[in-house]
Amino acid sequence: MQTTIIYITGVYDTLDLFTQELKNAFESMGYASFTYDARLGEVSKQALIECIEDGTKRGQRFFCVTFNNLGYNLSLPAGMTGTGMLLRQDIFQGIGESKGANSVKKEINLWETYEIPYINILMDHPFHYEKPLQNAPATSVVLCTDRNHVRYIRRYFKNIRYTD
């Protein structure tokens, strides 16, 4: 069974350099790679979804390895399930819900939908990432460069099940 590691680039040059080195190392160990380029927005997102959909049909496994929460909030397009199927919009609207302009629908997180482990390497203190860590995918694994950062996450972010 082939394993593909998904990388996220296009936000910070320094992190892109780290990512490229990780990619080179993992490819030398036989892992396949997919790079999501944030500069390409929806084009890159669609290519990622197609890669996951096609790979899943062949029994392929996926992991995302990224830095500083990049891509934690990637979501599926409105009305799309994790099987490539589009749902009718009214399925998302329950009886009695407002359908007005202020109505907010929860976006469907890509990592959770496809059950892809989201390995997040924090280069900075977690204090700087309160919102992303509070809203981290359920599949998150947070790796820290400092043991004090690990203790901080374990104390303040109970939603993150795995950190080291």
What spans do the regions from the language model cover?
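N-terminal pre-catalytic "stem/leader" segment of glycosyltransferase-like enzymes
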Residues: 1-113, 117
